[in-house]
Amino acid sequence: NCYRPVADLVEMFLELSDELGMKFFFGTYDSWCHWHSDHPEKELELNLQVVEEAWLRYGHHKSFAGWYLSQEISRGRKSVATLYRELGRCCKEVSGGLPVLISPLIDGVKENRKQSVSLEDHQREWDEMFSLIRDGVDTVAFQDGHCEFHELSDYLAVNRQLAEKYGIECWSNCESFDRDMPIRFLPIKWEKMRFKLRAAEAAGVRKVITFEFSHFMS
C-alpha cells in the first residue's frame, strides 16, 4: 500500500532552493536489493519510472540542476557500471541534458576491513569503471571517510586524474561525521574536517560537497 505524505518535501526543498539561488540535485531510488544481486535490470526499470515522474512533477523549478544516482559502491562492478551508464543516459534524455552525479567510496580500512584497498588496485578498477560510465555520468564525488587520514590525499589525486582522463568532473564528498568513534555517528571534529579539506585541495580537487549538513552540522 502507498500513502500520500502530509507534505511534499521535494517540492518544499525546491521552492527554498529557487528562493535562495541554490542548485538542487534529485536523488534516484535505491532498492538496495536489486543492484546488489548483480542484476541491475529491475533497479533500472524502477528508476526509469521515478525519473520520469520526478521530472514531470518538479522539472519546472529553476533550481532543479541535476541528478544524483543513489547507488554507492567502492570497487569495480560492471553490473553497477551498466546501471550508472543507462540510468544516467535516461536522466539526461528526460531533462534535456542536466548533469548526473555519483558519490562512490574508497574501499578503506574504515569500511569494516583490516586494511585499505591498495592504491594500485583502486586505480585499476576505477579506470575501468570510468571508461564504462563516462557516457552517463558527468561528476564523481568520492566519499572521503573510509580510509586512513594519511592515505586520503593519494586516493583523491588518483580519483581526479582518472576522472579527468575520461572527461568526468571530480569533486570530493567531505563527510561531516566521525568514523573513528565507537558511537555511529558523532559530528566530526573541525580539525579532522579541515584536514580532509586540505587533502582535497592538495590533490587538485576544486569543489567539495558534504554528507550530511542537515543531520550532523545543523
Whereabouts are the PLM-identified features?
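Glycan-processing catalytic domains of CAZymes
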Residues: N1-S218
